[in-house]
């Protein structure tokens, strides 16, 4: 399984892809390692966790994106993302997350995608705005967002 955009490959995190990312010096955090362990128990969760974002031109891992679990009973999933700082402000996050959102809606299992970001994370806020996500509410530190299937793009 692999998603593809004009500039990127987006691949689910597996033991093999973790090894490749680590060889490049990419810090695969506990969310990735935990996801791979979950996949060992239940292969159905593979697409509903972490994915690496790889630049086509040189096969460099730029960051990771993904969902925080399978869709719930209300067909809602939460998306998250993080990129190496030197790849910020180049459109990679927007391009990758848009592809993942499109994929999720095409599965038929998802009606709503939510996200949260720190109030002062202006780069992340801009990504969510470019994805046409709508602000739902906020706490003292976090802003909550969503996009519904019939409203994407």
PLM-predicted stretches and their roles:
Residues 1-78, 83-86, 99-103, 107, ...:
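GNAT-family acyltransferases
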Residues 89-104, 125-130:
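Conserved acetyl-CoA-binding loop-helix of GNAT-fold acetyltransferases
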Residues 111:
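Short acidic/polar active-site loop segments enriched in Thr and Asp
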Residues 115-125:
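Conserved beta-strand-loop-alpha-helix junction that forms the acyl-donor binding cleft
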